[in-house]
Amino acid sequence: MKYYIIAGEASGDLHGANLIKGIRANDPEAQVRAWGGDKMQENGADLVKHYKETAVMGYASVIKSLGKIRKNLKLCKQDIADYNPDVVIFIDYPGFNLRIAKYAKKNGYRTFYYIAPKIWAWKTYRIKAIKKYIDRLYSILPFEVDFYKSYNYPIEYVGNPLLDAIDAQLNRGELLDDFLKRHNLPHKPIIGLLPGSRRQEIKGLLPMMLRLKPHFPEYQFLISAAPGISEDYYEQFMDDDKNNNLIHNDTYQMVKHADACIVASGTAALETALIGTPQVAVYKVGGGILAHAVGRLVIKVKWATLVNLIMQKEIIKELLQKDFTFTKLKKELKAILPNGEKRANILNQY
């Protein structure tokens, strides 16, 4: 069969790569064409566009990028027509994917959605498009099943592939000393920084994270470098230790060996919890006051992180938008480090 898969960010690339492995296990002759990233390409996808060329976030950024978005939509539709796949598979990224789903469905292609759109959080009206244009919907979050069923739409829970991905990378049981030696790092405890996978996220989060360094001198701060983001981009926010701070392609080991992490709210927060490292989740979108005001109107859930949503209570502290301040971040980080008053509670509830 011929498969056309569309993912628009780093987490989608990870899920897409695992999906391709599963497809090939059941269909060894599968042909896969995709929008995604390095991981999908490494697993045999013929890549049309890398997500680093298509990712847009924040209301202001979307407005500025309307021309690019229209161009990519046109390219994607034409590429599907030229490739003529047996099925089009969408991975999250609903702003783009639901527009393509409309085109695909109207032109007779089967449409599957893997990693269901998080319409329980915002833009619930998208259920209309999902019902109209998506043939089969798959979820990796158990609580989504009841949500979609409440709208009389069938959804299949398929488990969370992050567990397999984490186990595969951590099963070698590497010790802290080995990790430090492999990365030429000093023998100091670690605070891990995961500022996101997009430039806008990194720009909004990393400078504040790095301001903490002088206040925790006994620690080394390590930054998880996102695929597709150049070292030059990170270095503009870093000090003279820049050559030692970036960790490439080894996020899970970094998180495992860290005493605590500061994490951009998203897939990384769930991964950090599954690994078992205490964390503070942070986020700040672009667009200033307007973006925050609009966000408050459209977001319908009490928490932003999947960790808290799955448990339906606050397990990890979320510092979002106006709450993402230096004073609060310093306080919450101190509270989850060894001997901190919140550390034991987080570890007990993971």
At which residue positions do the language-model features occur?
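Nucleotide-activated sugar donor-binding and catalytic core shared by glycosyltransferases
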Residues: M1-Y350
